[in-house]
Amino acid sequence: MVRGKTEMKRIENATSRQVTFSKRRNGLLKKAFELSVLCDAEVALIIFSPRGKLYEFSSSSSIPKTVERYQKRIQDLGSNHKRNDNSQQSKDETYGLARKIEHLEISTRKMMGEGLDASSIEELQQLENQLDRSLMKIRAKKYQLLREETEKLKEKERNLIAENKMLMEKCEMQGRGIIGRISSSSSTSELDIDDNEMEVVTDLFIGPPETRHFKKFPPSN
């Protein structure tokens, strides 16, 4: 009698489900043991029953030891995978940069009028348009720099004019002060001279009173 294929779904009957669990559990534990012995493999098996009971098998000294080995292996695989990803990313970036550099070199040569033999009319037209746009940007930048330089020169000129004006005013004020001091000194000197030239006239009567001789005495120091 041919045994029918068991449908893979949850067994609704609790008794049948428990019987099936026991049989399959024992078979699984047996297979794990055979695999570890026949193939010299490290096997760890953990089973929890529907009621939460633990069943386990380990070909090594303990399941935690196998689990620790598993976790370490997972970490190593993750690190290797990350390194491989980084290496592949670096390769992709290097390849992309090399393509960009090559494209820029070709474009530069074409702008210099080199390597145009294999260019089509459309490519030459695009190159001409690109050169026109570049020239417009260059002219605009040049005019901007000229305007800025002109403004700097004008500002410098204004500063020089202002400084010159200040110096002129300062010189004029200093000149007025000198003239004032000279005028004051001259007035004082004139007063001194007038005082010195004031004469004390002494009448010397030599002879008759009708004929008088005035003698001028020099100013006393």
From Swiss-Prot:
Keywords: Activator, DNA-binding, Flowering, Growth regulation, Nucleus, Transcription, Transcription regulation
Subunit structure: Interacts with AGL16.
Domain K-box residue range list: 87-177
Tissue-specific expression: Preferentially expressed in roots. Expressed in lateral root cap, root epidermis, root endodermis, columella of the root meristematic region, the vascular cylinder in differentiated zones of the primary root and in emerged lateral root primordia. Expressed in pollen.
MADS-box domain segment(s): 3-57
Protein name: Agamous-like MADS-box protein AGL14
Highest taxon, organism lineage: Eukaryota
The keyword Hydrolase belongs to this UniProt entry's keyword annotation: no
Gene Ontology CC terms: cytoplasm; nucleus
Compartment list: Nucleus
Miscellaneous information on this protein: XAANTAL is the Mayan word for 'go slower' in recognition of the retarded root growth phenotypes of xaantal mutants. Plants over-expressing AGL14/XAL2 show early flowering phenotype and flowers have vegetative traits.
PROSITE patterns to which the protein is assigned, alphabetical: K_BOX, MADS_BOX_1, MADS_BOX_2
GO BP terms in the entry: flower development; maintenance of floral meristem identity; positive regulation of transcription by RNA polymerase II; regulation of auxin polar transport; regulation of root meristem growth; vegetative to reproductive phase transition of meristem
Gene (name only): AGL14
One MF annotation (Gene Ontology) recorded for this entry: transcription cis-regulatory region binding
Annotated function: Transcriptional activator that regulates root development by controlling meristem size and patterning of the root apical meristem. Regulates auxin transport and gradients in the root meristematic cells via direct regulation of the auxin efflux carrier PIN1 and PIN4 gene expression. Binds specifically to the CArG-box DNA sequences in the promoter regions of PIN1 and PIN4 genes. Involved in the regulation of shoot apical meristem (SAM) cell identities and transitions. Promotes flowering transition and participates in flower meristem maintenance and determinacy.
